[in-house]
């Protein structure tokens, strides 16, 4: 169905020359661009027409689902006759302030102003109301971005994490941008067999010069929708047929509202502390709400912990750090007692998760994957020329699906407590700190790499305190003499060798987080091809 050129048994075989005409220019590497991807800014009558499915020859193509592109409702005609692209809601959204709109999945909008970045001013065609909507909750009508199976800029490892989530059957699939070939896509499918059990296979979707798509030259399609329809009806050489699109989690918002995007010092009265989650040396962590309707985490700092002026200066930098493996800073109350408002992670700290929570039953593949997620977040911090200074499992938070995010980055530098600033005082995390940082205060991204090596031991030992049986002074002395922790029980030698690499005396000999991310993401798949050729493809 929708197949432009499907090979039947009696059909003549297509030549392979078409492959050579593909544009194989090298594309970006996933994760190197820290800037979120947005649609371009546009005015009411200058929105690019994402809904145009007409090929180079001007022939109208049939859109997936049998709707002809010439009659779809994705374009609103203005009085002057110009077309304005309509957007459709991909999720439900509940308004948080009087400035934004509540809406339901499937609702259509005309975009009035997109100059606010993550928040667009829009008019609902259902209610006629005008207000702000989060831009990552909508997509152009009839575009591939609006399809349930399209995940956009998603890396191979993250695709595998989502597809292997509990409850997805064999044949669950998604399509994402190719990491290696600009303009191409990847089809990722959950599969199962006796030898591997549940696993994911990836197929490259290539683009024809005339705008079509194919996995094999024997079956070419004018649209991705038609390709999905075809392989939903038959495996046709894939590991299995496409059964159901992977579930999309709600996209995260990097701001509480359009107003807090730039003015994010908020009144203390707008926050409600509901449940205390933890109590530390410098304050408490609460689950709470903002404006009575938005769940957040609130870190309250004891008065005197840090200078409000210094904190606000550092928070300006922290607010700009946006990555899906970093806990997002939303807002602050900068007068003492200082409140730090962040996204809420429902499984708590990685340390507690490993010692007393669901993490006790985790096997090595899950633990290595969690380490890879932390490395991915730290690789972003590395690219941004920032430093964490206090990387350990207590400062990693866990969410549903074993998602890990880095918290408290940058705060350690601001602490003014004498028991901490002495670096060898009772409150200082000596066992996680590189010797050059503990002894001489030389904190760099390479001292963070040392700490990451210690965090790896926490993962494989399910939260055991590093250097068991040794106090802080003994650890400092022994490490300076060259002592390194031995390989933990049941830890693979190759993983311990990575820890030792992180603990090199010379900081410059330690690996980068980019290397650590790649090593850990490919730890169990290094010997397998990244893309499947497919049977009979």
From Swiss-Prot:
Residue ranges of domain SH2 in the record: 149-246
One GO cellular component term: dendrite
Positions with a binding annotation for ATP: 277-285, 299
Residues carrying Phosphotyrosine: 185, 420, 531
SUPFAM superfamilies: Protein kinase-like (PK-like), SH2 domain, SH3-domain
Lipidation (N-myristoyl glycine): 2
PROSITE patterns with a match to the protein in the record: PROTEIN_KINASE_ATP (PS00107), PROTEIN_KINASE_DOM (PS50011), PROTEIN_KINASE_TYR (PS00109), SH2 (PS50001), SH3 (PS50002)
Residues annotated with Phosphoserine modification: 21, 26
Active site: 390 (proton acceptor)
Post-translational modification: Autophosphorylated at Tyr-420. Phosphorylation on the C-terminal tail at Tyr-531 by CSK maintains the enzyme in an inactive state. PTPRC/CD45 dephosphorylates Tyr-531 leading to activation. Ultraviolet B (UVB) strongly increase phosphorylation at Thr-12 and kinase activity, and promotes translocation from the cytoplasm to the nucleus. Dephosphorylation at Tyr-420 by PTPN2 negatively regulates T-cell receptor signaling. Phosphorylated at tyrosine residues, which can be enhanced by NTN1.
Inhibition and activation profile: Inhibited by phosphorylation of Tyr-531 by leukocyte common antigen and activated by dephosphorylation of this site.
Functional note: Non-receptor tyrosine-protein kinase that plays a role in many biological processes including regulation of cell growth and survival, cell adhesion, integrin-mediated signaling, cytoskeletal remodeling, cell motility, immune response and axon guidance. Inactive FYN is phosphorylated on its C-terminal tail within the catalytic domain. Following activation by PKA, the protein subsequently associates with PTK2/FAK1, allowing PTK2/FAK1 phosphorylation, activation and targeting to focal adhesions.
Subunit structure: Interacts (via its SH3 domain) with PIK3R1 and PRMT8. Interacts with FYB1, PAG1, and SH2D1A. Interacts with CD79A (tyrosine-phosphorylated form); the interaction increases FYN activity. Interacts (via SH2 domain) with CSF1R (tyrosine phosphorylated). Interacts with TOM1L1 (phosphorylated form). Interacts with KDR (tyrosine phosphorylated). Interacts (via SH3 domain) with KLHL2 (via N-terminus). Interacts with SH2D1A and SLAMF1. Interacts with ITCH; the interaction phosphorylates ITCH and negatively regulates its activity. Interacts with FASLG. Interacts with RUNX3. Interacts with KIT.
PANTHER family assigned to the protein according to its UniProt record, in alphabetical order: TYROSINE-PROTEIN KINASE
Protein name: Tyrosine-protein kinase Fyn
Species for this entry: Bos taurus
Gene: FYN
């Amino acid at each position: 169905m929708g197949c432009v050129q499907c090979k039947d048994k009696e059909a003549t075989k297509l030549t392979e020359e078409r492959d050579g005409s593909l544009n194989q220019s090298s594309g970006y590497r996933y994760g190197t661009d820290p800037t979120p991807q947005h649609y371009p800014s546009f005015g009411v009558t200058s929105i690019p027409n994402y809904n145009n499915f007409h090929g180079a020859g001007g022939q109208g193509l049939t859109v997936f689902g049998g709707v002809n592109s010439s009659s779809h409702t994705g374009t609103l005609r203005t009085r002057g006759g110009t077309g304005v692209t309509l957007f459709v809601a991909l999720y439900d959204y509940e308004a948080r302030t009087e400035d934004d709109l509540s809406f339901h999945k499937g609702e259509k909008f005309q975009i009035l102003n997109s100059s606010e970045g993550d928040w667009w001013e829009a008019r609902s065609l259902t209610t006629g109301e005008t207000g702000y909507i989060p831009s990552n909750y909508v997509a152009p009508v009839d575009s591939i971005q609006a399809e349930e199976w399209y995940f956009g800029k998603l890396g191979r490892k993250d695709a595998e994490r989502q597809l292997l989530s509990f409850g997805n059957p064999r044949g669950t699939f998604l399509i994402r941008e190719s990491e290696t070939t600009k303009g191409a896509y990847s089809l990722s499918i959950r599969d199962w067999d006796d030898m591997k059990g549940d696993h994911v296979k990836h197929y490259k979707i290539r683009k024809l010069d005339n705008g079509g798509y194919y996995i094999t030259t024997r079956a070419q399609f004018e649209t991705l929708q038609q390709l999905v329809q075809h392989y939903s009806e038959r495996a046709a050489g894939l590991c299995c047929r496409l059964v159901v699109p992977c579930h999309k989690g709600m996209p995260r918002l990097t701001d509480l509202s359009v107003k807090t995007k730039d003015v994010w010092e908020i009144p203390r009265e707008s926050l409600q502390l509901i449940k205390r989650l933890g109590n530390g040396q410098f304050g408490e962590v609460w689950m709470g709400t903002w404006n009575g309707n938005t769940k957040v985490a609130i870190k309250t700092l004891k008065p005197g912990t840090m200078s409000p002026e210094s904190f606000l200066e550092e928070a300006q930098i922290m607010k700009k750090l946006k990555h899906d493996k970093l806990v997002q800073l939303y807002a602050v109350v900068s007068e003492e007692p200082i409140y730090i408002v962040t996204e809420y992670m429902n499984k708590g700290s990685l340390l507690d998760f490993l010692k007393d929570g669901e993490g006790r039953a985790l096997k090595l593949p899950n633990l290595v994957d969690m380490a890879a997620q932390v490395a991915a977040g730290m690789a972003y911090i590395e690219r941004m020329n920032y430093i964490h200074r206090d990387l350990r499992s207590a400062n990693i938070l866990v969410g549903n699906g074993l998602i890990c995010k880095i918290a408290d980055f940058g705060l350690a530098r601001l602490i003014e407590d004498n028991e901490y600033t002495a670096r060898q005082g009772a409150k200082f995390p000596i066992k996680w700190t590189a010797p050059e940082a503990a002894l001489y205060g030389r904190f760099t991204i390479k001292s963070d790499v040392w700490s990451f090596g210690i965090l790896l031991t926490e993962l494989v030992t399910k939260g055991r305190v590093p250097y068991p049986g040794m106090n802080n002074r003994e650890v400092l002395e022994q490490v300076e003499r060259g002592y390194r922790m031995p390989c933990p029980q049941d830890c693979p030698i190759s993983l311990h060798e990575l820890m030792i690499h992180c603990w090199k005396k010379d900081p410059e000999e330690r690996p980068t987080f980019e290397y650590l991310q790649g090593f850990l993401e490919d730890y169990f798949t290094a010997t397998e091809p990244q893309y499947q050729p497919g049977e009979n493809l």
